[in-house]
Amino acid sequence: MERKQGEVDHLERSRPLTDKERVMIQDSWAKVYQNCDDAGVAILVRLFVNFPSSKQYFSQFKHIEDAEELEKSSQLRKHARRVMNAINTLVESLDNSDKVSSVLNAVGKAHAIRHKVDPVYFKILSGVILEVLGEAYPQVMTAEVASAWTNLLAILCCSIKAVYEELGWPHLSNSTS
């Protein structure tokens, strides 16, 4: 059963990252990225198990129901690596707002135009990222670090939503994002 949208509403409000938050995000990410393949797969499997409607955008594995089978999917692993590399680029670029904007713009455009992904899934994915990282890295994802990540993911969601709006995304008025 899919969760209610309200669980990720805190991702609709963002503010600029502080220097301290940037450092916490980059330090924590360095630890997570050491296991980027496993972390990425865990994130996507959790997304697809808890929010099965998110699989509709992936013809290669949208009919796979079993979590273990999803984990073994080479296509899922490939996409998980792409997601983790995009997050890595974002985190590495936190000191360069132009680069951050460029990355988020490219991701937003690709998902709106080419993949036609409803922008609400960025909020959902962000919530899943926070959940999985908190469970997998409890010593790293302290409350303060999780708060910094929440702010970064809110920036991501707001920026991508702005890209969708700029493109005149036809479903935005119907979306809960």
From Swiss-Prot:
Places the protein is found: Cytoplasm; Nucleus
E.C. no: 1.14.12.-, 1.7.-.-, 1.11.1.-, 1.15.1.1
Gene3D superfamilies, per the entry: Globins (1.10.490.10)
GO term, biological process aspect, one: oxygen transport
Superkingdom, taxonomy of origin: Eukaryota
PROSITE patterns, sorted: GLOBIN
Reactions performed catalytically: Fe(II)-heme b-[protein] + nitric oxide + O2 = Fe(III)-heme b-[protein] + nitrate; Fe(III)-heme b-[protein] + nitric oxide + H2O = Fe(II)-heme b-[protein] + nitrite + 2 H(+); 2 superoxide + 2 H(+) = H2O2 + O2; H2O2 + AH2 = A + 2 H2O
Domain Globin per the UniProt entry, residue ranges: 16-165
Keyword tags: Cytoplasm, Heme, Iron, Metal-binding, Nucleus, Oxidoreductase
Gene Ontology terms, MF aspect: heme binding; iron ion binding; nitric oxide dioxygenase activity, heme protein as donor; nitrite reductase activity; oxidoreductase activity; oxygen binding; superoxide dismutase activity
Matches recorded under Pfam families: Globin
Cellular component aspect of the GO annotation: cytoplasm; nucleus
Amino-acid positions noted as binding heme b in the UniProt annotation, renumbered to this chain: 79, 111
Function: Probable multifunctional globin with a hexacoordinated heme iron required for the catalysis of various reactions depending on redox condition of the cell as well as oxygen availability. Has a nitric oxide dioxygenase (NOD) activity and is most probably involved in cell-mediated and oxygen-dependent nitric oxide consumption. Under normoxic conditions functions as a nitric oxide dioxygenase (NOD) but under hypoxic conditions the globin may switch its function to that of a nitrite (NO2) reductase (NiR), generating nitric oxide.
Subunit structure: Monomeric.
Family under the similarity heading: Belongs to the globin family.
PANTHER family to which the protein is assigned, alphabetical: CYTOGLOBIN, CYTOGLOBIN-1-RELATED
Protein's recorded name: Cytoglobin-1
The species this protein was found in: Oryzias latipes (Japanese rice fish)
Gene: cygb1
